[in-house]
Amino acid sequence: MQESKKPGRVSIPLSAVRRWNGGVLTSNGYVLDERRLGELVAVPEEERGDRAQLRARLQRDGYLFLAGLLDPAVVLAFREYYFGLTGPVADRASYRKVLFEEIVPGAEYAAFCAQPALKGWFEWFLGGEPFLHRRKIIRQTAPGENGIGTATQAHYDLVYLRGGSDHVLSAWIPLGDCPVSRGGLTYLEGSHHRVLEEEAAGRLKRPAASITADLPALATQYDANWLVTDYAAGDVVVHTAHTVHAALDNVSTELRLSTDIRYQRADDAIDNRWQNHWHDQDGL
């Protein structure tokens, strides 16, 4: 099978693209151009214990895909806890009450996000006391949900965190297996370099909003690939505040559940707006 190519990039083979939903990947209903797809690459095992190499990789790529960082049993236990509370609810209002009054501020969620395998990794990687922002987000996407605003649109996190350090790191954690068809996160290759340059030059002081829902057009604008992969329970992706990312549509038959949280050094500037529990009406 011949590979699809684009100048200066190496795309994944068409055979690999086609195993993901028959080669048709969408986000908010927009069909991604298979010529502008790449594979999100996990950090090799031999580099996992080398902090200098990891920092260099993060600076180069804008993300660290840490396959199997967490114990899958711990991840699946939290997933079971979540659906144990939300499963019985019959309407949207009841679901939101359970989510924002029980799960988000609950001890179980706090413990999951600060588990030793996660907090300890950030302490080691950051080289200092880690600080976990209280505003931690859980996202659920049902099969077949599509259209503008359903999947997370393309954005970079700094626009929501300008009140603190731009060295804050995000951790995206699939709460259960999340193959491409289930709507996992996708990263725009090398986008952080352009964002950093334009932010530094004062040309990109974007408001706290997404860039666009049109991922194909953004890939063309940046001359970059959208990076995708199949995630498994236990995987974590750490990315910088300047890395453009989005979510794919869930075209599977299962609910997609994930959480995204932020860690940084405790001695760096902290955005105080993120020190309350997340709510979808909190204005951030």
Mark where each language-model region is.
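Conserved double-stranded beta-helix
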Residues: Y95-G106, L118-L188, H192-H193
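Histidine-centered catalytic micro-motifs
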Residues: A151-V159, T243-L248, I261, R265
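Short conserved catalytic/interaction loops centered on acidic-Pro-aromatic/His motifs
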Residues: L185, L248-R256, D271-Q275
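Non-heme Fe(II)/2-oxoglutarate
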Residues: Q53-W124, P143-N146, A151, Y187, ...
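A short hydrophobic beta-strand segment most commonly corresponding to one strand
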Residues: A171-I173, E189, T253-D268
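Conserved, charge-rich beta-strand/loop surface module that forms ligand/interface-binding patches
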Residues: I270-L284
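Fe(II)/2-oxoglutarate
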Residues: M1-R60
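Double-stranded beta-helix
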Residues: C178-V244, D268, H279
